[in-house]
Amino acid sequence: MGKAAKKKYSGISTGKEVPSEQHMNTVFKFNTDLGQHILKNPLVAQGIVDKAQIKPSDIVLEVGPGTGNLTVRILEQARKVVAVEFDPRMAAELTKRVHGTPAEKKLEIMLGDFMKTELPYFDICISNTPYQISSPLVFKLINQPRPPRVSILMFQREFAMRLLARPGDSLYCRLSANVQMWANVTHVMKVGRNNFRPPPQVESSVVRIEIKTPRPPVDFNEWDGLLRIVFVRKNRTISAGFKSTAVLEIMEKNYKAYLATTNDAMVDDAKGSLAEQVKQKIETVLAETGLSDKRAGKCDQTDFLKLLYAFHQVGLHFS
């Protein structure tokens, strides 16, 4: 007996549309300012859902369901789907699409801005992401009290490549270092612009994000605060980033707050200007870690953790 053919989820458009999409141009004028680019290729839609490896007991969060081309496929596999939709017209279309079907009872639609919505518990997140909320969405997922087991997310190609970039890559940036601290990110597939209606101006990619378990024992705001400083100019030396007046003022303010919680406040005040002390502490940390002349764009997670720990040892904080 011959081998069964493998499913292929290429980003090449088949030219065939999901049936319920065929009348959409006469019903809607899509708002591209809201990132409304509806995925119309059924093979790509099915590929995205399959990569989530949904269990029958799973609750799936979908961000920006649109007219439901992903939603109806997720509903076939999940216990429940919570769909967060900003556009009331899209929510109404999705409601009509499942009305009178067994899937209707499994679908909950939350109408509103995803970034302002308090989310219920969910196991998996799937999203054809409105590109303007790509970064906020990723960090909201990462910082959930109980983050999803896995997220399968469609992004603008360049944004996806930034998530995946490694030290030394041209696209390696604060986003790369930050997300990779908390999650493992892998590339799933490229998706060409002709797979959408209306076609976006850029190509897309789907990525898989799995939150690390257990969560690294690092304060998110401290980690983020350090990266914001060193990646202001990723190709300048790290020491240059700490010479900025604005950065020194923030570091001094945080140091004062730290001293207020310890018994060392009077001692440090007696040593002279706090601003001067902060400068000296920064210089000492950078010299002792050997990172003074390194560039953030070449540094890895170990380098940044080493730097953060050394700053904390001398009472300097970033949040």
UniProtKB/Swiss-Prot annotation:
Q: What's its catalytic activity? A: adenosine(1779)/adenosine(1780) in 18S rRNA + 4 S-adenosyl-L-methionine = N(6)-dimethyladenosine(1779)/N(6)-dimethyladenosine(1780) in 18S rRNA + 4 S-adenosyl-L-homocysteine + 4 H(+)
Establish whether keyword Lipid metabolism is in the entry: no
Q: Does the keyword rRNA-binding apply?
A: no
Q: Specify the enzyme's EC class, one word.
A: transferase
| GO MF entries | 18S rRNA (adenine(1779)-N(6)/adenine(1780)-N(6))-dimethyltransferase activity; RNA binding; rRNA (adenine-N6,N6-)-dimethyltransferase activity
Q: Name one GO biological process term.
A: rRNA methylation
Q: What is the name listed in the Swiss-Prot or TrEMBL entry for this protein?
A: Dimethyladenosine transferase
Protein species of origin: Eremothecium gossypii (strain ATCC 10895 / CBS 109.51 / FGSC 9923 / NRRL Y-1056)
